[in-house]
Each structure stands twice: as structure tokens, then as C-alpha cells.
Regions:
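Ribonuclease/tRNase effector modules and their secretory precursors
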Residues: 1-91
Length: 91
């Protein structure tokens, strides 16, 4: 993605660790019932968020910061148990 919405090095690391490109995070937002929650970890003074949503019948989580009106993804992966519980509790 040439629009600067993610760091190419972080994209490569995410692909190696989670087998997902960071751009996959956009698909999580396509879930009409996606959940956005503040991330517990605050790094470098940035307010981070998690988006949790279903893609292809599986639950995924993207960690991101807002850049204007667009998310800049830091990590994209399958959701953990706590994120699954939060998603289903909100629904």
C-alpha cells in the first residue's frame, strides 16, 4: 500500500508472525458489527485502538492508530479469548 497507512517493515513482520498482511485490517472494518476498543498499551504517546470483527466466519483483531480518518495498522491477527468475549458481549 503506497498511501503510508502502514510501515513496510511492520507489514513484513506481521506476515511472518501471523501470516496476514496489514492491509487485511481493512476487511475487519467491513463487519457491520465490528467493535473498536481502546488498546491497553500506550506507546510513544499514541492512543492505540483494537478493531475486532468477523472475516470469513473467523474473528480477527487489528491494532491501529488513527491517521486522520483512516486507520494505520500496527498488527493484524486472529483474536484472542478476551477479544472474542468482548466482541460477543457487545453484540
Amino acid at each position: 500500500m503506497a498511501d503510508g497507512r502502514f510501515d513496510p517493515a511492520k507489514d513484513a513482520a506481521n506476515r511472518a508472525k501471523h501470516n496476514l498482511p496489514l492491509v487485511f485490517g481493512d476487511r475487519i472494518f467491513e463487519d457491520d458489527n465490528h467493535l473498536i476498543i481502546p488498546s491497553i498499551r500506550e506507546i510513544d504517546g499514541e492512543e492505540r485502538f483494537k478493531v475486532v470483527g468477523i472475516v470469513g466466519e473467523k474473528l480477527f483483531t487489528g491494532v491501529f492508530v488513527w491517521r486522520g480518518e483512516l486507520p494505520r495498522f500496527i498488527s493484524v491477527r486472529r483474536s484472542n479469548k478476551g477479544e472474542e468475549q468482548a466482541y460477543h458481549a457487545a453484540g
